[in-house]
Amino acid sequence: MMFNFAQPVYPLVLTAAKNNPENAHQQLLKTLHRLDENRHTVWGKWILENLDHSFTFEDSRLQQNLWGLTFKTPVGLAAGCDKDGLAAGIWDHFGFGFAEIGAVTLHAQPGNPKPRLFRLPQDKAALNRLGANNQGAQKVAQTLKETWQRQPRQIPIGINLCKSKITPLEQAAMDYVGSFRYLEEDADYFVVNVSSPNTPGLRSLQEGEQLNVILQELQSVNSLTKPILVKISPDLSWESIKLIIKLAKTYQLAGIIATNTTIKREGLKTNILEKTGNSIQEEAGGISGQPIRQRSTEVIRFIYEQTQGTLPIIGVGGIFTAEDAWEKITSGASLLQLYTGWIYQGPWCISNINRGLVRKLEKYKLSHISEAVGMDFNS
């Protein structure tokens, strides 16, 4: 017997997430990890079947091949959700076409002091200053190896690599390379994260020479020729983005992920952060969700225009609906990622977005999603 899984309990999950979002999230990941460990038991199979029934939707018109990988749908899970890869084998059962693990650093690190994750419901946003808390590349590699032994990857898995807090900026390249060496066999693509606002000095690596060295060193050890992308900030100037595009071409990067969270606070409805009593202007961290939707789309359009559509873009930032997704695709994104939207809209939002994308294809008389990529520039 099948039923729409989680619908009766989702309001309870939301209440828990509101009271302590980080704790609720950790409990969810631990539960999903336990489910993965028991995927071959009777109850494990039953739950996974119900997840598939409730949350997945596939249509051949949405399937794409990029970098030698098959993406059944264009909607993936953004980094920041599953930092240690605990649920890496489960995300396909929620309808995601791919999932990005991390951010992962070479050295395990606890992240910043708590509280460090806040929901801003008035803005349909989140503020996080987690600080890349994760178990470190070696442990994450072990977790992923065990996961793939139970069940081979069903969707492409990416790993978002970040610099360890204890590593000096001038040694950043070796930090990324060290993580990559541990993890290169356990994922399908890799992301150089130089845009998180929560690791001191990290965003300065986007500017020129140091990113140059990181990309050079990574590609020099990339013997399996894994696709490597770079994830950029929405707060960069157009000139800085042009420089990153140039580096992407020089080092034959697979694409650009646009964008990470913003440190800007303009236009927010939230004035005071309830949990701390402080003004939102004074609170450190990156904002994700609806407030960055427009800016991330502008960055996507700029990259697509500058590269004439020759460099694949993964669009992320403020995707809640099929309309949001369509806007990013027609602006130039081949693939999409979301996390904050998934939390606010519930786990049904992935299949809702994919169904909505198919309706858009039918409306515009297009036979495949790839025809919609950058469509705004062709009309």
Swiss-Prot record:
Binds 1 FMN per subunit. GO terms for biological process: 'de novo' pyrimidine nucleobase biosynthetic process; 'de novo' UMP biosynthetic process. Substrate binds at K83, N128, R129, L130, G131, N193, N198, N260, T261. It comes from the Bacteria. It catalyses: (S)-dihydroorotate + a quinone = orotate + a quinol. Pathway: Pyrimidine metabolism; UMP biosynthesis via de novo pathway; orotate from (S)-dihydroorotate (quinone route): step 1/1. Its EC number is 1.3.5.2. Its cofactor is FMN. FMN binds at A79, G80, C81, D82, K83, A103, N160, N193, K231, T259, G289, G318, Y339, T340. GO terms for molecular function: dihydroorotate dehydrogenase (quinone) activity. One of its GO terms (cellular component) is plasma membrane. Its main location: membrane. It is an enzyme of class 1 (oxidoreductase). It is a peripheral membrane protein. It is found in: Cell membrane. The active site is at S196 (nucleophile). Keywords: Cell membrane, Flavoprotein, FMN, Membrane, Oxidoreductase, Pyrimidine biosynthesis. Belongs to the dihydroorotate dehydrogenase family. Type 2 subfamily. Catalyzes the conversion of dihydroorotate to orotate with quinone as electron acceptor. Monomer. This is Dihydroorotate dehydrogenase (quinone). It comes from Crocosphaera subtropica (strain ATCC 51142 / BH68).
